[in-house]
Amino acid sequence: MDFGVQDIKNIIPHRYPFLLIDRVSYIEPGKKVVAYKNVTSNEYFFQGHFPEMPVMPGVLIIEALAQAGAVAILSQEEFKGKIAFFGAINKAKFRRNVVPGDTLKLEVEIIKIKGSAGIGKGTAYIGEKKAAEGELMFMIGDKN
């Protein structure tokens, strides 16, 4: 199953300039997702981080993982039409710089759901090498 940007926008509320995933190549609703972010030299954050040596901010890599995780959890039947709120990040590690031209592969596995709260383990890759990883805590709520 391959989701494009419009499909993603039908699941999560994020929009430009804060929608940080471009494509979903695999989804097991409520369990696992594989998504991608194509990092280009036109990204707004490169204007200030850093103009002479553009590097994607680590917090935005984590946010991209959180958005991918939100697609996984909000695709589960009982959570369709809801919104996922980022609760916490634990054990975050940044292993390599993400620069223009890179394609981030974002893998998130939902490891625990209890009621409307849960935890996902996210890993971002460039090729086969880890760029970042962490545990993402989230809450599911109503849009209104």
Swiss-Prot record:
Listed EC numbers: 4.2.1.59
The enzyme's main class, written as a single word, is lyase
**Compartmental location:** Cytoplasm
Q: Which is one Pfam family of this protein?
A: FabA
- GO molecular function terms here? (3R)-hydroxyacyl-[acyl-carrier-protein] dehydratase activity
**UniProt key word DNA damage:** no
Tell me, in one coarse class, where this protein mainly resides: cytoplasm
InterPro entries xrefs: FabA_FabZ, FabZ, HotDog_dom_sf
Reactions the enzyme catalyzes: a (3R)-hydroxyacyl-[ACP] = a (2E)-enoyl-[ACP] + H2O
Q: Where is the active site?
A: 49
Superkingdom of this entry's organism?
Answer: Bacteria
Q: Does the keyword Lipid biosynthesis apply?
A: yes
Which keywords does the record carry?
A: Cytoplasm, Lipid A biosynthesis, Lipid biosynthesis, Lipid metabolism, Lyase
How is this protein annotated for GO cellular component?
cytoplasm; membrane
Sorted alphabetically, the Gene Ontology BP terms of this entry are: fatty acid biosynthetic process; lipid A biosynthetic process
Sorted alphabetically, which PANTHER family does this protein's record hold? 3-HYDROXYACYL-[ACYL-CARRIER-PROTEIN] DEHYDRATASE (PTHR30272:SF1)
Summarizing the function annotation, the protein's role is: Involved in unsaturated fatty acids biosynthesis. Catalyzes the dehydration of short chain beta-hydroxyacyl-ACPs and long chain saturated and unsaturated beta-hydroxyacyl-ACPs.
Q: Which family does it belong to?
A: Belongs to the thioester dehydratase family. FabZ subfamily.
* Protein name in UniProt: 3-hydroxyacyl-[acyl-carrier-protein] dehydratase FabZ
Upper classification of the organism: Bacteria, Bacillati, Bacillota, Clostridia, Eubacteriales
